[in-house]
């Protein structure tokens, strides 16, 4: 017994020494005389991690913004074995995402994505190369083109009507708006991804939401210290994620097979249709034989996971932050409701075609994306070669973070940046399509989010209906300034706590 214990102890100690030697060796290799961007001092093994102690690490974009005030808008940190550069100004965003876009077109695949997505076959983390070019073209031309997004209007109209009916059932009582909006967005994304005939749709939605939540809770330690990849294994989080994925994969296998069988029927003509879902589109393209790289079942699954991870939480989070800010700012609420109700005067049913001329509501959405950006650090990039930015050298394989949260609160760019003022987007035409570097909620350049049109469409119609059909009150006599606005950082940065409000039906007939 003692011999076994001694053998185990000696073996564990030797493994620890090997891991320690590798970490120190890697650290020494990276300690070169390159003119790196300024940053906090570094210690062996842990690098700059100790500087984050005592800072708001639950909201890392706060911590990075605080450090940037001392070290500048282009800052280098060594987080364990991860070499990281953080950009925190619109000027640095432009230098990187425009002038060096090609050189930083790679995405580092985080530990969670490696566990779940077959080494980055999904849209977000697919490595830069031929397959990325193909899936990017498919995304922009087929899956999320303006025409395709518009063709899915019937799904948004149907599901938003169901959401409004459910809210009517809670009239004059405290109801969970977070759940209502999340249910709407998840179902819209599911129907767009694989249609409405799936018997396990609700189960898949539940599993996907569980996976997104679990993925956001997985430690980043394996990315900072690859040798510590055993931690999620010991904690059970890796197995938990894989079990969810395994269960969801069974549903996706059934869905994809059902779609394949449909393509074999005599009624299938192989032509493009406005009622095609994402699986239909991918199978149609594969069947033409025109794709340079064949699409596998695993690739289709990865695309679906990308759509759910990027499309559900982002849209619902934006809608809920918009409603939260409107409840905190009654004058803005009054103004946007007046616009919506004047434009839609007397309508009992609102169609998507009815909401095309609501400039102030669109300004409310933009201001929400500025003040409550769902992805405050955007998705990281990685240098494929050494680059020079602002006189500094950034080595190959350096991860780059864009602190969009810091940029959207820069007082040199935004007057009263902490205040919710939609008028700023009326007075100055600023778009979110990646050319205004002070406002990049969907990123910019080659790796800009291809689904931004889809995401915005999933916000506009439900928000217009919430504003048109109901007057809203805070529960329990709460004052606007008392509304909890605490954020929670994860895959997206949403409300930490659900939003509970009291809806009162608006008298539409009284408008006439």
Curated annotation (Swiss-Prot):
Entry keyword Ligase: no
Domain of life: Eukaryota
GO molecular function, one term: monooxygenase activity
UniProt KW Nuclease keyword: no
Record field: transmembrane: 1-21
Membrane topology: Single-pass membrane protein
Matching Pfam families: p450
Reactions accelerated catalytically: tirucalla-7,24-dien-3beta-ol + 2 reduced [NADPH--hemoprotein reductase] + 2 O2 = dihydroniloticin + 2 oxidized [NADPH--hemoprotein reductase] + 2 H2O + 2 H(+)
PANTHER family: CYTOCHROME P450 FAMILY 71 PROTEIN (PTHR47955), PREMNASPIRODIENE OXYGENASE-LIKE (PTHR47955:SF9)
Protein name, UniProt field: Dihydroniloticin synthase CYP71CD2
Name of the coding gene: CYP71CD2
